[in-house]
Amino acid sequence: MEVTFVKEFTDKSLHIRAMSESGDEMASGTFALKEMRFGGKYITALAVCGLETKPQYRRQGLIRRMMNIGETFGREKGAPIAVLHAFSFDFYRRYGYERVSDTVITSFPIETLGFVPFFGGLVQLTKELVPAFVA
């Protein structure tokens, strides 16, 4: 099956879509340049974002080809490292990625942040302010 990789560029990102001969989107993903603090200074890193393949097109090497395209974009833009928030660490190890940290998502009462300076332009998100975004 013939596959075409459609690439949409901005100055700081690349979105890739793998398309079949019939025009079906088989896989997609985004690679974005982000400024990150690393080793005591800010550097440009390549963020690997939301890679996906439709189930019927898996195991055809589409993600591998998209990773090659995306990582080349990052290198050409001067990004010495790439980062991602993986759904499966084992999946990305085959591409040379290693687990270097964990992220913990937690919630707590806003009152516990009383020690943080308050800037007048900031308001607490409430159901009344943004009902569509708060469950």
What spans do the regions from the language model cover?
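Conserved acetyl-CoA-binding loop-helix of GNAT-fold acetyltransferases
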Residues: G50-T53, R59-T72
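A conserved beta-strand-loop-helix scaffold within acyl/acetyltransferase catalytic domains
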Residues: M1-E52, A135
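Conserved active-site alpha-helix within GNAT-family acetyltransferase domains
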Residues: R75-P80, A86-V104
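Short coil/turn motifs at secondary-structure junctions
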Residues: K34-M36, Q56, F89
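Long alpha-helical, hydrophobic tracts
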Residues: G70-E76, E128
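Amide-forming acyltransferase catalytic core, primarily the GNAT-like/NAT-type
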Residues: T103-A135
